Amino acid sequence: MRFSVVTSYLLCAAASYANAASLFGLSFPEPPSANKPIPGDSPLLQCDVDQSQSLDVTQVNLVPNPPQRGENLTIAAAGVLQTTIEEGAYIDIEVRLGYIKLISQTYDLCEQLEENDIDGLKCPIEEGVYELNKIVEIPSEVPPGKYSVIARAYNVDDEQITCLTGEVIFPAY
């Protein structure tokens, strides 16, 4: 109840503000987006672009795009790493199905690279240009819905490596 009252109040205030601005001929610039598209064929965006990041993701391709239940997904990514990734680097991942948070977890980035055999990468990962390929199986049991993912990777000193976000819709069966 309290949420709906507060939400209604905020929506009314926003509508009143918009009406007053148009009534007096005022226009306000759109706030800058903190996301930018990543070249290639994927739904991924680089997020937190207003913050310093040590990985410039130059391209991501998914085959098939969009991903399909019960099929393999081939991920091809390229980027330029500007700082060495050391042991102790970590990644914060959040996955939502609609408004429902399914996962919100921190993982050891170096362990994940080794466990998932990402082109043989192991920490420390030196500065340089990288092209990575990985095939993952999408389970046929994935429930229908709109999935949102955000992943922020940090080095051991808490400097951001990168931030990626995207949405995938799995239609009804």
From Swiss-Prot:
Q: Which PANTHER family match?
A: NIEMANN PICK TYPE C2 PROTEIN NPC2-RELATED, PHOSPHATIDYLGLYCEROL_PHOSPHATIDYLINOSITOL TRANSFER PROTEIN
One GO term under biological process is: intracellular sterol transport
Task: List the source organism.
Answer: Kluyveromyces lactis (strain ATCC 8585 / CBS 2359 / DSM 70799 / NBRC 1267 / NRRL Y-1140 / WM37) (Yeast)
The residue ranges crossing the membrane are none
**Which keywords does the record carry?**
Lipid transport, Signal, Transport
What name appears for this protein in its UniProt entry?
A: Phosphatidylglycerol/phosphatidylinositol transfer protein
Q: Please explain the role this protein plays, according to its UniProt record.
A: Catalyzes the intermembrane transfer of phosphatidylglycerol and phosphatidylinositol.
Q: Which SUPFAM superfamilies match?
A: E set domains (SSF81296)
N-terminal signal peptide: 1-20
Molecular function as annotated in GO: sterol binding
| Quaternary context | Monomer.
- For the keyword Transport, the answer is yes
Q: Which top-rank group of organisms is this from?
A: Eukaryota
> Which residues lie in the propeptide?
21-34
